[in-house]
Each structure stands twice: as C-alpha cells, then as structure tokens.
Regions:
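All-alpha RGS (Regulator of G-protein Signaling) helical domain and cognate RGS-like helical scaffolds
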Residues: 2-424
C-alpha cells in the first residue's frame, strides 16, 4: 500500500478467538535437557582433524554436500516463524508509506528532516516490498497478506520513534529464531533480508537524535515476544487470513520511561514515555519548547537528526529506579481482536533484562496487584560494554531461570508480562 490508507482500531466482533493450535500438544512446556552429547568437537591445535570432502573445504557444515537448495519452509516451526516475519514486513511497508502521506513537507522540516530524508524513508518502504515478496514465496499460497493497522503517532518525531521501536522488534525477532529454522536455505535468505532491517533501525535512531548503535551485540527475542509487540498495532485482517500459533503476553509498562525528546530525558511525567496504552507507543513529543532538545543547538544536548549524538545526560543509568505497571491476562488483542493475552507464570518476583548477549534479573518489589519497581542493573556483557543500553526488552518473571541467547524462548512459561525499555 502507498499513500493514505484506512487506519484505526477494530470495532467489529471477532469470529475466531486465540492462537492457532495443533491437533495434539505433547507437553505443557519444553523440558530442559543437558548439552547435546554429540557436541564434543574441540580443536586445541588449530589444524584439520577430519578428512576434507574436497579441496579447500573443511569437514562439516550444514547444506554443504552439494544438494540443490530448496527455498521453502520445512516444518511447522519454519512456517509460523516466517509467517510472523511476513506480518512484520507488511506493517512496515504500510507504516513507512503512511507516515509520508499523513505528514507534510513542513512537518518533516520542523523535525529536522529534509526531502532527502523523506526519499530515504520512501526507499525503505520499497525495500519492504522485496522482503514481503521473498517471505511470501518461501511460504506459498497460505502466506499472510497485508492487513489494516492502527498507529499511535501524532507528529513526525513520534512517527520516527515508533519506527525505531517497531524495527527493533522486527530485527530482534528474527535474530531470536533464525538459527533454529529447519530450512537452512530459508535462513540464508532471511539473514540477507534482516541485515537491511538492522540498517533501517539504526537510521531511524539517527533521525531521532539517538546514538545509532550504542551496543556491541544486537538482541534476539522469542517469536511470542515479537508477536506480542507487533499484534497490538494490527487492527484487522481479511477473514481468510493465516493465523499464528505464537503466544500474546500481557503488557508491561515503564511508568518513568525516558523521553528522548526531552532536554533532561529522565525528568518525565508518569507514562510520558507512551502516547497511548501499547508497549511500542512513542514518547510524547508535544512538550514545552524550553524542555525540548529537538532544536537545541548545544553539543551534548541537541537531539535533532544526526549521524551520531552523544548526550551529556543519558536516557538511563545503572541504579535508576524503574517503576512498573502491567496488565492482567485475558485481554482481546491483535487482528480483529481475535487473539487473547495469556500467561502460565506464577506471581512475579523478578524483572528480566534482555539486551545484547545477556539475560539479567533484578528483584521486583511489589507495590500493588499490578505495580512494582526495580533498579536498572549495572551488568556488563564484556568489560566496558554495559548490557542495558539501546532499545531493549524487559519482562516480569516468576523465577530467575538461567538461559542464554540460543534457548531464551524457554523463559516464556515464566513470563508474567512483557515490555520495551528505552535504555539509550
């Protein structure tokens, strides 16, 4: 879609409720197992240990035996993962074009963005046509189609902020599942697509006056996390739309979320970090001019568009008290209000901070049935790389289960609510 399209909340009655389910479900959760007993390779000398199948071709690897590639999903896991990715590509195609249609040239100029910047965003939308075509072809005739969407932004700054958040979800969602795909051929194509998504996310951060890449590693998240974030902005889909199997988790909100539009980003009113009641909503940009950093031509404080910004007052810091509220499960959400938020977790006890390669827990102090607080951790990935930075993810959990990037999805049964944290 290009130009202005119909957008707004869904007002009808859903004809289907809940995620798509298999005919049989074998267990309530995936049980943790010890390391793979065949994963024993170790090369202490740095020499070839096994016969080479051909010259200049070390032994091993997947899909390296000469078999002709088949660029199609190869399991239910593959199908549901790529279908989720296609939902993401469709909304981005509509979103980028919609912002260009609803805001004038003058609106963009007030935000410091020129005709060249608008052309750049238009080209990103064109990129999404290619991504959507690729994923559709790898899914076949049951591939999801484009839907109608409900966006939260009211200004160009809020449009850009929403873009940097939704592309963060798109990128991190793929990093979370790409190495679990049964089809290595599909993973190859997807990796060459998501590399472009990463550049889009960085570009929108630059347009918002944030540091383009303040981390050493990008974050991967489970599919149910990506779907939880994304589905809130899909108003309705065609009646025969392919549905998804992923869980919709309850929303978690940061009451004192940093506002990147502010001269002092932590001096925010409660819930100023959201223009609405959805977790990827942009921060309020309509603040008094003497409190705004947008047109402030002072090094260290200006947050107008730039290749890079280094703010004197960071958006967050270790030890910051983070005030939280969250929703109860059972909320109708997503396309046609046909999905329902759910959780299998017990009482929340911890806040999980998911950023870069790290999963860090901090204790949660409850202040009510659906409110509490914690403190931003000072954890590092490696020395000199604070883990909590960038546009990252937080979750309430009932335990502090040890997990790593490759098996992070095993946290899902323990998640009470899920949110996004604007750390930097």
């Amino acid at each position: 879609m290009t130009g202005f399209t119909s957008h707004g909340p869904y007002s009808g009655t859903p004809t289907t409720i809940g995620a798509v389910m298999a005919n049989t479900t074998l267990a309530t959760a995936i049980a943790p197992l010890p390391p793979n007993p065949t994963a024993t390779y170790y090369n202490a000398q740095g020499v070839l240990l096994n016969p080479a199948p051909a010259p200049y071709t070390p032994n091993g690897g997947l899909g390296t035996n000469g078999t002709e590639p088949r660029y199609m999903v190869n399991s239910d896991f593959d199908f549901e993962s790529i279908a989720l990715g296609l939902y993401q590509e469709w909304i981005e195609l509509d979103l980028f074009n919609n912002g260009l249609a609803v805001f004038s040239e003058e609106d963009f100029l007030e935000a410091g963005l020129t005709a060249e910047d608008r052309a750049y965003i238009a080209f990103m939308a064109i990129q999404e046509t290619g991504h959507a075509t690729l994923l559709t072809n790898m899914l076949g005739e049951a591939a999801p189609v484009q839907c109608t969407y409900n966006y939260p932004f009211r200004t160009v700054r809020e449009f850009i902020d929403f873009n940097q958040k939704i592309t963060r979800v798109g990128e991190s969602g793929v990093w979370g599942f790409i190495n679990h795909l049964d089809s290595r051929e599909v993973a190859q194509m997807l990796s060459q697509s998501i590399a472009t998504e990463a550049r889009q996310q960085m570009s929108f951060r630059q347009m918002l006056g944030l540091h383009p890449m303040p981390v050493w590693f990008e974050t991967g998240i489970p599919q149910s996390w990506a779907w939880t974030f994304l589905s809130q902005y899909i108003s309705s889909c065609p009646a025969n739309q392919t549905r998804l199997a992923w869980q919709n988790l309850p929303n978690l909100f940061v009451v004192n979320q940093a506002n990147p539009n502010r001269l002092s980003p932590n001096d925010t009113a409660p819930f100023e970090g959201y223009v609405g009641n959805r977790t990827l909503d942009p921060a309020y940009s309509t603040i008094p001019s003497n409190e705004s950093c947008v047109n402030l031509n002072v090094t260290g404080y200006n947050c107008g568009p730039a290749i890079a910004r280094n703010r004197s007052e960071p958006l967050s810091f270790p030890g910051k008290q983070v005030n939280l509220t969250w929703q109860a499960p059972g909320l109708a959400i997503g396309p046609n209000n046909s999905y329902v938020t759910s959780t299998t977790a017990g009482q929340p006890q911890f806040v999980a901070w998911v950023s870069q390669l790290n999963l860090t827990y901090t204790p949660l102090t409850l202040t009510g049935n659906y409110s509490g607080y914690t403190y931003q951790p000072a954890s590092e990935v490696y020395q000199g790389d604070p883990a909590a930075n960038d546009t990252m993810f937080i979750a309430l959990t009932d335990s502090d289960i040890f997990l790593t990037p490759f098996n992070l999805s095993m946290i899902n049964p323990h998640v009470v609510a899920l949110g996004l944290y604007q750390a930097g």
